[in-house]
Amino acid sequence: MHFYIPPPPISGFWLGPLYVHMYSVFMLAGALVLFELTNRRFIVLTGNREFTAFAVTSLLIPVILGARLWHVVSHTQMYEHQPFYKVFAIWQGGLGFIGGVFSGLICFFVIAKIKKVPPFTFLDALAPGILVALCFARLGNYFNGEVFGTETTLPWGLKLSHEGFKDLNVEKYFHPIFLYEIILNVFIIVILLVLEKRVFVKTVFPKGSVFAAFLVLYGLGRFALEPMRYNLQQNSFGLDLNYVGAAAMIIVGVLIACRHTIASGKLRNSGD
């Protein structure tokens, strides 16, 4: 007998005249958990009780736009022959996490400067919450029939429904990449909390080290998972942007972790 992960039983439900997608339910739940975790952590670190709400509400639209843009650019062939409004149909899925990270990061530094808040302290408070929210989002991907991999004979393979997968042999089983990434995210959260409690507080590490570790570890994890991921559509550039994005996350993480060393080196050079 072959055990497998069944197709999602539903994709949404009716709430009066409104059809609510399960994807949006999990996205909303993830956003609420992210806010609560980040707010509590930032209050402990700084005593500031107002900034988290301001930051989350201010960054919501830039993050969604960046995530959607990343998805569309990564899958241009999917939208070439579709009505233009499909580009904006985020309720059907299609948000690129990596794009959301970078668009949010850029906008965050702007508002942190305006509000005169220590940016890297907030990013340290934010990092675990991002991963928890992403776990919720990946559950939403399951209900949307997204983020699965290539065919597999492993006993935890994902069974796809017949709807929406005409180009695939739905009698086969596929790697549940969404589940792999949930496990990866939980693993990274544990590492971040251990580093924060047992390493970063006992040694001289700059603020932002937790966030830097998140970027590096997640980037490495995406590199490991990406070869198993099934891409229904490719972009028109012949380039897998997820590899580029994962590499960029690693590089930015290393730069954040090493910024004090880089800055001190510049100061020494300027004095020569």
Curated annotation (Swiss-Prot):
The keyword Membrane applies. It is a multi-pass membrane protein. A 1,2-diacyl-sn-glycero-3-phospho-(1'-sn-glycerol) binds at residue 138. The chain crosses the membrane at residues 15-35, 53-73, 94-114, 117-137, 174-194, 199-219, 237-257. Keywords: Cell membrane, Membrane, Transferase, Transmembrane, Transmembrane helix. Disulfide bonds: none annotated. GO terms for molecular function: phosphatidylglycerol-prolipoprotein diacylglyceryl transferase activity. GO terms for cellular component: plasma membrane. It is found in: Cell membrane. It comes from the Bacteria. Its main location: membrane. Pathway: Protein modification; lipoprotein biosynthesis (diacylglyceryl transfer). GO terms for biological process: lipoprotein biosynthetic process. Its EC number is 2.5.1.145. It is an enzyme of class 2 (transferase). Catalyzes the transfer of the diacylglyceryl group from phosphatidylglycerol to the sulfhydryl group of the N-terminal cysteine of a prolipoprotein, the first step in the formation of mature lipoproteins. Belongs to the Lgt family. This is Phosphatidylglycerol--prolipoprotein diacylglyceryl transferase. It comes from Tropheryma whipplei (strain TW08/27). The gene is lgt.
